[in-house]
Structure formats: structure tokens, C-alpha cells
Amino acid sequence: MFSWCALLAAAVLPPCVSAYQAEPVPAVLSVLTVDRYADDGAPGSLRWAIATANQAPGRHRIEIAAVGRPPYLIRPASPLPEIKGPVQIVGGARDVDGQYIVIDGSAYVRGKGTDACPGAEKGQFGANVRTTTLPGLVLRDTQGVELSGLEIRNFCIGVLINRASGNELHDNRIVANKGGAGVMLTGDDGSGQSTATTTVHNRIVRNEFIDNGDGLELTRGAAWNLVADNLFRSTDANPEPSQGIEILWGNDNSVLRNRFENYSDGLQINWGNRNTIAANTFTGNSIGVSVSGRGNVVDGNTFSGNGIGIAVRPQPRSEANRFSANLLSGNGLKIERCQAGGACVPGQPRGAIVFGVPGLEHASFVGSRGLGVDTDPSKRARICAAGESANCQPAPNHGQAPPRLLALRGGDGQRELQGEFAGTPRSRYTVEVFGNRAAGSDEAERYLGQLDAVVDGDGHGRFRYRLPPDSADLANLTATVTSADGATSPLSAPLALAH
């Protein structure tokens, strides 16, 4: 019997290749052992190992041995050579006794706090000013670099990934890098302009980021990168607790299952598009997530004990960003930590989801924009007041108003929520329903479910939602609505449940 499958296979597969053939076995790498911590360039030093591996990218693995007793400390006297991949650089102690090999920049990054770390513009210093100054390890115009088992501390930028793709940083500690970020992924072309497709498919997983200015940045074209299972923590020792992660003109990145503690903003998106922020935990931040841009998805995260859970910032044109299935409780605290972010405007509304929160780009922002940055309010954008539209920025998410929860009908496990909302005529919306156990809560402690609702020709939408059986312990309900293009409203006013 004639086989079209066999003919097709013969046509598209080279000789002796099966569709089920495993990928080739990786070549055996030559190991360069670092067993001398003096920074003199001699064989056995880290400087020697990087320079040697750079001569033949793809052929070496650098293993840094644990010499003596911890802490295992390498203190470079001057900037190390940029790293050319593919290459692995591994601190050997972590998998043995949990210790890290420390690469410490304090021998040549000198000065008090952020003053040691000037930005690219003269007179500017600190996090959230453009900079590539004094990094520890540099991956520039390269690919395939793997870093693990390292503690990188006391630089202006711990690891700079500049126009570099397909790299992986895992199981490291990134500590007290004060001027730019713990790890900076940027497509910066050298003059501050973005480059597309140069800083993609990097993986930053299972690292600890402690007391950096910004923990991590995805900026100027950084796209399709994964940041997962990391801890971003700021303590009282941090002089400039800015963002756990800043995304600036970065698109299509995935930030998953991380924890963000005690920053001005846990995560800040500045005109980034289609980024996915999912299954993370935000606590103790002035703002959990601060959003501008379009098509971003904030889904299934937990926000507790923040000033604002999700802050949605105005921009020149109102764009749609989606917030779905997030758990929000205990927010609304007066956390006035405003280092290039946060919520410090007197009388600022706080709580679960707040529209119209000013950022650095707005004249009404209160806080630090970075040392040396021009603060003239006449050069900043105005946020439109109610009923205003000229020379100001409109409400975000198309100004989508929250739904109104009208009544609860039925009983004995058959309770049905009834509500209404305003929307675009003849269009579909998604309603998400939440519950709270505390009678005074107006947040979204528990996610109950969702339903679709259609708006009639007069712009009026109605919905009914049957509550699940496990909702008997709830004191009240709240809800959001999301348009077909992904613009989510703030939470509704709560509707009390009679027991």
C-alpha cells in the first residue's frame, strides 16, 4: 500500500533522520577551575577564566571552587572582562552546602550609596535614571551564558544583559547593587534608544534579589523574557527601595510566581505592552503593580498589605489592560515609600484597584524621580479632572466604571447575584465575582468565578450569577467588568450577604 506519510517524510527529512530522533548530545565542555580569589589575572583567577573562555566561546565551563572557609569572596579591583557566550559560570559551593561564591564590587565602586553610581546623563544618580554604569558581570551582544551559584553584590548593576539573548541566571543571590538594578536586561543601543529582538528569550529563575535599587529591569526593547520563582525583597538597609521589577518599553515578557516585598512599586510597567504578570505575591509595597501601556495582563496574583494593590496610570491615550482573578485583601495601608514610584500624593485614594494614580511622568507625582532629574511640573503631563479633556491625560482603561451589585435572590444554596453595568452598546463583557469574609472589606479576598454579559443598544448590561455552595461564610460580594478588548474596571461597591 502506497504511503503518503512515507513520501512526505522522505521529502522533508534529511537522510538517516527520524521525526523521533533526540537532539544531539551536547559537546563535552573544557572546565576552567577558579581556585584563586586574588584578582591578578593569573591562571586560576576569575579574570583569567573569563578571558580564556572568551577566546573560544562555546567550549568552556567555568567552575569557581570553594577555597577555605565561607564567605567565599572574590573582590575584583577593576571591571571584569565582558562575558562572551556560550559559557557556564558556576559557583560550586551552593549545591554542596548552600553557600554562594561572592563577587563583590566594593573594591572599585566607591562612594556613598547611589552617589557612587552616576547615570548616563550628567548630574543624575540612582535607580530609574538611564544608566549602564559600573556593572559587575556584563553580557553584551552575546548569547548562551549561564550563571548560577553566585552572590553578586555592591556594584551599580549586578548583571548587565545588554542586547543579549538566550541567557539564563538561576539560583543566585543579587544583593545591594545601588545605582541601576540588581539585574538589568536592556536593548539600549548606547544612546538610550530601544532595539527590537536583541534582548529576548532570557530566563531569570529562582534567584534572591535583596536590597537593590531596582531589583530587575526589562527595558528598551527587552521582550519574550521569563522572570519566574524569584524573591524581590527590600529591607530597612536599602537607601533607595524603588521597584522590584521595572518594565520600560518592554513587551511580551512573562513574570510568574515571584514574591515582591517592601518596595515603592513591587512591579512598575511604563508603556510596556502585552506583558503577563501572573501568580505572583505582593506585600508591604506602596503599590503592588503600577500599570501603563496596553494589552498587559495581571492575572491570578495575591496582593495583601500594600498601599494600593493595582494602580492604573493615565497616559496620552486611554488603553486597555486586563486584571483577572487577583486576590486582594488588607490593602489600603498608608505606605508612603515613593522612590521613583509609590503613592505619596496627599489624600491619594488607596485600596485594591485604583485608577488615575500619578507616576513620574505626571506633574502631580510626589516623591523622588531620581537624583538630579528635572522636577519642573510644567514639563510633566496633567491628569484630566472629571469632565475635562483638553491638554490632559484621560482616565485609564477607557474610564470603565465598575458594575453595580443590586440584589441577592434565593436561598438554601441557590443564591443568585443580580447586577448591572454601563458599557459600549452591543458588545460583550466579562464579569468577575469576588467575596470577602470581613463585613467591612471592599476588596477581593476570594475569587468566585466569571460570566459573560452582553450590553444592549442603550449601553446597559445586566447579569445574574449563581453563587457556589462554598460561599456561605462570606460577608459580602464585589465584582469587576472587563470589555472585549481587555479593559477592566475597578471593583464595585460591596453588596452585603444576609445570613
Predicted regions and their residues:
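Residues that flank catalytic or metal-binding motifs in active/ligand-binding sites
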Residues: 85, 133, 165, 200, ...
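N-terminal, post-signal-peptide segments of secreted/periplasmic proteins
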Residues: 16, 20-158, 163-165, 327-349, ...
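Consensus "Asn ladder" position of solenoid repeat domains
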Residues: 145, 150, 167, 172, ...
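Extracellular beta-strand/beta-solenoid scaffold signature
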Residues: 117-138, 154-162, 176-199, 210-222, ...
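Edge beta-strands of extracellular beta-sandwich domains
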Residues: 486-498
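Bacterial N-terminal signal peptides
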Residues: 3-15
